[in-house]
């Protein structure tokens, strides 16, 4: 959940980094 919220807060760049 925390990771999902973090990637969402990044907008897009964070999501790619998370993956």
From Swiss-Prot:
One of its GO terms (biological process) is oxidative phosphorylation. Pathway: Energy metabolism; oxidative phosphorylation. The keyword Magnesium does not apply. One of its GO terms (molecular function) is oxidoreductase activity. Its main location: mitochondrion. Component of the cytochrome c oxidase, the last enzyme in the mitochondrial electron transport chain which drives oxidative phosphorylation. The respiratory chain contains 3 multisubunit complexes succinate dehydrogenase (complex II, CII), ubiquinol-cytochrome c oxidoreductase (cytochrome b-c1 complex, complex III, CIII) and cytochrome c oxidase (complex IV, CIV), that cooperate to transfer electrons derived from NADH and succinate to molecular oxygen, creating an electrochemical gradient over the inner membrane that drives transmembrane transport and the ATP synthase. Component of the cytochrome c oxidase (complex IV, CIV), a multisubunit enzyme composed of 14 subunits. The complex is composed of a catalytic core of 3 subunits MT-CO1, MT-CO2 and MT-CO3, encoded in the mitochondrial DNA, and 11 supernumerary subunits COX4I, COX5A, COX5B, COX6A, COX6B, COX6C, COX7A, COX7B, COX7C, COX8 and NDUFA4, which are encoded in the nuclear genome. This is Cytochrome c oxidase subunit 6A2, mitochondrial. It comes from Ovis aries (Sheep).
């Amino acid at each position: 959940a925390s990771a999902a919220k973090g990637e969402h807060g990044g907008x897009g760049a964070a999501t790619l980094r998370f993956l």
